[in-house]
Amino acid sequence: MSEKNTIQFNFSYYALNLLGKQMYTNRWSAISELVANGLDAGATNVKLYINSINKKKSILEIIDNGSGMSYNDLATKYALIGRNKRLSENELSDKIKGRKGIGKLATLFLSKKYYIVSKKAGVTTAWMLDSTDKNDNDVPELI
């Protein structure tokens, strides 16, 4: 075989939901993980807004002043499940609170649909993951 082909792994909604649900014992531990992600991004200010007046459509917003994510950051860092932030030379490895690179899955413990709004270098971008009507075998996409 003279030609070398590579195959990248994909994760189905089932796998991501399973990981998200199995990692946390309650919603507060999942929220704590998401706050830690902001702190890992250098945030010095993190605010939580919770609107649970309508229990079926509760809203949780976590707003921080961390470094933010560009489209490239989202594609190469956020979407990579299990990324070790400590190996990146551009990040403050001694202050990193995350341990396994899968804390972003805490969102799936909390909801089947979530939004990411981020600002980096003056550019605001937004993405959404919605697994509400997806089959277990579908591959997730942030849109």
Where are these regions (language model features)?
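GHKL (Bergerat-fold) ATPase N-terminal catalytic module, capturing the glycine-rich phosphate-binding loop
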Residues: M1-I143
